[in-house]
Every structure is written in structure tokens, then in C-alpha cells.
């Protein structure tokens, strides 16, 4: 078992591995769903991908700007490493500070943090740090939120929120994308609440769903089309969970999905209209030993299907984390190309990390 601040991640049995990055193919399906292809882009393990980066350990969250490359939260090394859609590593890499690394210790003297969720900030006025605009914002298991401002410090994010004293453990991060007056949402797994911050990093309120069983905690979070989706899971247990929908003001709307198809659900993404039979669905990644990506009707929550390979077998990725689509350019990929991060591996490779992409193969690859 590998753990971070109380969250334990079980190692898979050696027999579960039949392909790279812990890829497992299970079961058969109708031909209509058997048309997706996965491609490893970067790994910190040799022979796993064409590009190798030792810092890509327990790759967790991922984010991009409209034309910017992909930024990855490397949870086990405390860095954010950056890659284009082909997996080519960019020269810049950014250290994520841990609790206590404020303005008095700007060089990270307390060591690196444990980044989880990451978001792109498109506002030049919201979420400034020390008067400088920030571009990417990170949450950590240490209970901190840091922002990267190239004008302030190009090589390290700057601490903006430190809630380590209240034992906060932020497992996910979401942001609004309005012209102004934006909010940031951090999923506090320990205190089972969503901390909502304004554009000055001030806490507005904490919210959640009091009707969720008490053994479930907030885990993943995503702002999609003006609504905040929150995934609840039972820490260290496995199958079963909930996905709630809230307004951007933190008002509960409904429980959209619940049941055994959610297994440590964390990543969420809205599929575009050209993603094959799973087009226009809500995709949800399961961060389990046998992690899958399931698709649901975004309005009713009805199960639609699971991403499967060309032969009709379910694509399974051990300890799957983030999922997000490209922006429609060569830097961060096609709008129907799904990029994923895979975290901990198995056995001796518990600190593995992989950045990969999935395309609907019937269309001849990404468009």
C-alpha cells in the first residue's frame, strides 16, 4: 500500500498487468463501442512510452490553456511538468511548495508539496499573487493552494492559501471561467467539504451535501458548463459513490449519478460531439486498481457505456486520475482527443506515472 497523508492506494496484483502502464483489457462489447485507441505519450518508467521523464511520478491532475501545452501535477515529486500533445517535454518545470512556504521562504526550503488538482486561470485580474497575474493554480494534499505567476517566479508556484492547520487535504480543484468575479473550489477530503474562494483567495464558504452517507468524502471536482460536479468516494474502500451537481454559488442541484459504476471516481469531462458512440456524454474516471472511464447521460445520469479498445475489450488503467480533452491545436491536441493521467503503478513501480491519450479510432484518429 502506498499512502499520502492518510489516503492509501492499494497496489495491484502482478497478474493484473498485461500491457503498458498497467493496462488491462476486460470483457467484450458491441462493435459500436469497440473503437477507441490509447497511446502512451510520457512515462517515468522505461519502455512504457516514447518519452521518459523521471519527475512524472503519480501523475494526478492535468490542465491546459486554450493554446498552452498540458501541465501535470506530479504528486510524488512535488513538481508540475509540461508536455505538448505528442508528449514532448517543455523546458519549463515548476516546483509546487508545501505548507509554510510563504513569501518568507520563496525557494521552497520546506520541500516540495504534494500537488493534486490543477486548473488554468484565464483571468488577468482574479487570483493574483503579490499583485501578479497567475496562470495555473494547484491544490495539494498538504492543504495548500498555490498559484504560478511567471512574472513573480517562473520556476515555482507561490503559496496563496494554507489550511494545513485545520488538517485540510485538497484532493481536487475546480475554477469558473467567467469574464470576471471568478471562484475557485477545493475538495477537502479530510473535512468532507468544498472550500469556495473568491478571486482574492478569500474563503467565501464551505459547502457539500449533508444527505450523502457519512462514510463518503469529497474526492474529485470539476466545473463543467457553469455547474460544479463533485465526486464522493469512500476512502480506501472501492466501488460505490456519488456525483453531485451544484451551482457555481454552491447551491445543491441534484445527485446525478450513484452506485457501483463509481469506484473512487475522480476525473470528469464533457465529451464533444465527435467522440464516437460516447459523444456528448459525461465521462468519469475511476481511480481504482482496475480504473475505467465510464460515460453517463449528462442530464439524467443514465449509464451509456465504457471506453473500450478496437477489439471490444474494456480499457483499464491502474490508478487512473485526470481526464480532459484537447483544445483543438497541435500544442494540446484535438478537441476529441482525451488526455489522461495514470498514477501509481504496481509492486515495485508504485511511484509510476504516465501521460496518455485516447482517440475514437473509427474516425482515423483525432480531428
Per-region residue spans from a language model:
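Glycine-centered signal
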Residues: 4, 29-31
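Sequence/structural signature of beta-propeller domains
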Residues: 32-367
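Bacterial N-terminal signal peptides
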Residues: 14-27
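Generic low-polarity alpha-helical segments
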Residues: 1, 18-20, 41, 268
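N-terminal secretory signal peptides that target proteins for export/translocation
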Residues: 1-13
Amino acid at each position: 500500500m502506498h499512502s499520502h497523508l492518510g489516503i492509501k492506494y492499494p497496489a495491484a496484483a502482478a497478474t493484473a498487468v498485461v500491457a503498458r502502464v498497467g493496462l488491462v483489457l476486460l470483457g467484450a462489447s458491441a462493435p459500436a463501442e469497440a473503437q477507441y485507441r490509447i497511446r502512451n505519450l510520457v512515462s517515468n518508467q522505461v519502455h512504457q512510452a516514447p518519452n521518459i521523464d523521471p519527475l512524472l511520478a503519480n501523475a494526478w491532475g492535468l490542465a491546459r490553456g486554450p493554446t498552452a501545452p498540458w501541465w501535470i501535477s506530479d504528486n510524488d515529486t512535488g513538481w508540475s511538468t509540461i508536455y505538448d500533445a505528442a508528449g514532448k517535454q517543455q523546458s519549463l518545470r515548476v516546483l509546487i511548495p508545501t505548507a509554510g512556504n510563504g513569501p518568507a521562504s520563496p525557494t521552497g526550503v520546506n520541500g516540495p508539496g504534494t500537488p493534486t488538482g490543477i486548473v488554468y486561470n484565464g483571468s488577468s485580474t482574479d487570483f493574483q499573487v503579490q499583485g501578479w497575474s497567475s496562470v495555473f493554480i494547484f491544490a495539494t494534499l498538504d492543504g495548500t493552494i498555490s498559484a504560478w505567476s511567471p512574472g513573480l517566479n517562473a520556476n515555482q508556484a507561490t503559496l496563496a492559501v494554507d489550511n494545513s492547520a485545520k488538517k485540510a487535504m485538497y484532493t481536487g480543484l475546480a475554477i469558473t471561467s467567467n469574464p470576471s468575479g471568478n471562484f475557485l473550489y477545493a475538495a477537502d477530503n479530510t473535512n468532507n467539504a468544498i472550500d469556495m474562494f473568491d478571486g482574492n483567495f478569500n474563503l467565501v464558504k464551505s459547502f457539500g451535501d449533508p444527505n450523502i452517507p457519512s462514510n463518503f468524502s469529497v474526492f474529485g471536482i470539476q466545473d463543467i458548463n457553469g455547474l460544479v460536479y463533485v465526486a464522493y468516494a469512500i476512502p480506501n474502500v472501492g466501488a460505490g459513490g456519488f456525483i453531485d451537481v451544484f451551482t457555481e454559488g454552491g447551491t445543491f442541484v441534484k445527485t446525478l449519478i450513484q452506485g457501483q459504476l463509481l469506484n473512487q471516481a475522480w476525473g470528469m469531462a464533457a465529451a464533444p460531439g465527435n467522440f464516437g458512440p460516447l459523444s456528448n456524454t459525461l465521462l468519469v474516471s475511476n481511480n481504482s486498481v482496475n480504473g475505467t472511464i465510464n460515460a453517463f447521460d449528462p442530464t439524467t445520469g443514465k449509464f451509456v457505456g465504457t471506453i473500450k479498445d478496437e477489439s471490444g475489450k474494456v480499457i483499464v488503467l491502474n490508478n487512473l486520475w485526470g481526464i480532459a480533452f484537447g483544445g483543438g491545436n497541435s500544442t494540446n491536441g484535438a478537441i476529441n482527443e482525451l488526455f489522461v493521467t495514470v498514477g501509481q503503478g504496481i509492486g515495485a513501480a508504485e511511484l509510476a506515472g504516465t501521460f496518455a491519450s485516447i482517440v475514437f479510432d473509427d474516425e482515423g484518429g483525432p480531428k
